[in-house]
């Protein structure tokens, strides 16, 4: 299992996505007297003297679910057809998750607060984006292995 490069790619995607559950912020909307920080635990309002948490968006459930789905894909290495199908599903779900975060980055400031605000990217956003190529490369590696095994079966 560890000899295959897609195992390493899937493991790196799990690490990148799972590390966002440590509370790293994805992005922040900053105004003159207030800032809104968006992480996997929700949206936190940071005022000058106090902070309050809005847990209306539980992103951590989808992050943990996607990490578990990536792990299941990693562990189904004996059945390449199923692993390829699951890897494609993981890549699609990961792409949807990234696209939703990009849309919220551009439209979220207007939803949360009125007036002028500045956007700041956090380390969690970079890790979220960094895991997507690993997921895609794992899918390509699984496809290459399946093609190699199918050609060997054809020669028998």
Identify the role of each PLM range.
Residues 21-28, 71-78, 102-109, 136-142:
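Transmembrane helix-loop junctions and nearby membrane-interface residues
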Residues 2-11, 24, 34, 45, ...:
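Extended, charge-rich alpha-helical interface modules
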Residues 98-156:
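Alpha-helical transmembrane segments of multi-pass integral membrane proteins
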């Amino acid at each position: 299992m560890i000899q295959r490069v897609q195992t390493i790619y899937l493991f790196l995607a799990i690490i990148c996505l799972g590390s966002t559950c440590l509370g790293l912020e994805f992005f922040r909307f900053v105004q003159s007297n207030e800032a809104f920080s968006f992480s996997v635990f929700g949206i936190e309002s940071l005022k000058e003297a106090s902070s309050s948490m809005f847990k209306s968006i539980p992103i951590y459930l989808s992050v943990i679910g996607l990490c578990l789905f990536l792990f299941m894909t990693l562990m189904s290495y004996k059945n390449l057809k199923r692993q390829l199908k699951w890897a494609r599903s993981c890549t699609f779900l990961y792409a949807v998750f990234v696209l939703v975060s990009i849309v919220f980055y551009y439209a979220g400031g207007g939803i949360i607060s009125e007036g002028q605000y500045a956007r700041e990217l956090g380390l969690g956003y970079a890790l979220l984006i960094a895991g997507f190529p690993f997921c895609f490369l794992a899918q390509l590696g699984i496809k290459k292995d399946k093609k190699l095994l199918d050609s060997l079966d054809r020669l028998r």
